[in-house]
Each structure stands twice: as structure tokens, then as C-alpha cells.
Amino acid sequence: MSISQACNTLYNDLTWKLYSTPNVTLKNGDGYSGGTSVCGANSTLKNANYVKLCITNNGGRNPTEIVIDRTSDKSSTHCNCVSWSAATAYFVQLSLAVLADGSCNGACNVGGWGFKCTVKSIYYR
């Protein structure tokens, strides 16, 4: 998983397909405490080689892209596929840690930062 350029660059990259624009805000721990694994049911994202999330931190600062490389293991549910609610809005791997400087990093486990991030859009290819 790698961090790349600011969110607005992703609209210029035609190799990515838009999956959804959830605009859902996640707080510390949401990925696991409030979610369920949906990898098996979500074939579009499960079968994608790469998934990209455009996120912003508290108040919309520091837009960041998180790119998740799923080429090595598409069967894994841990750190690859969780949901942020019991509804139908699913996203591939994300617990978010917001660092002290306000930037967002994707992580398998949320750190004890107590901040929140907003997932603005999800792309795949």
C-alpha cells in the first residue's frame, strides 16, 4: 500500500474506474468495531488489482490518495476488505490513522489518535 498525490489528480487518470463517492466519515476504530467483512460479496472490488481511495482528514484538509495493491492476495479479508457500516456501503481495506501533523495513513489497525477521516471517493482498476 502506498500514499500518492493529492486527490484531485485522480480525476485526470483515465485508467481508474469510479466505484463510488461515499463521502463517509470514519472515526477511530470504525473499520472493525462497526463493520463486517464483505470481500466475498463485493466482487467488483475483490477482483480489482488496485483500489484507490481519496480521503481527507478533519475538516477536509490534506486530501490524500491511498492505493491498495491487491495483486498478491485477493482472497484475504484481513486488511483488505471491511465495511464502515452494516449497510451496503463497502470499501476495500481501511482503518485510518490520522497522524499528529494532520495527514492520513491507511493502516490495518487504527492508532489511538482519536481523529477521523472522510472517504470521498473510491476507484479501482
PLM-predicted stretches and their roles:
Residues 1, 60-72:
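Short, surface-exposed terminal/edge motifs of secreted or surface/virion proteins that either
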Residues 1-31:
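Glycine-rich, low-complexity segments
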Residues 21-47, 58-65:
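Surface-exposed ligand/attachment interfaces on beta-rich extracellular proteins
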Residues 49, 98-108:
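Noncatalytic modules at the cell exterior or secretory-pathway interfaces
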Residues 52-62, 125:
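Short, flexible beta-strand-to-coil junctions
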Residues 71-89:
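Terminal beta-strand-rich extracellular "head" domains
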Residues 110-125:
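Short, structured beta-strand segments at or near domain termini in extracellular proteins/domains
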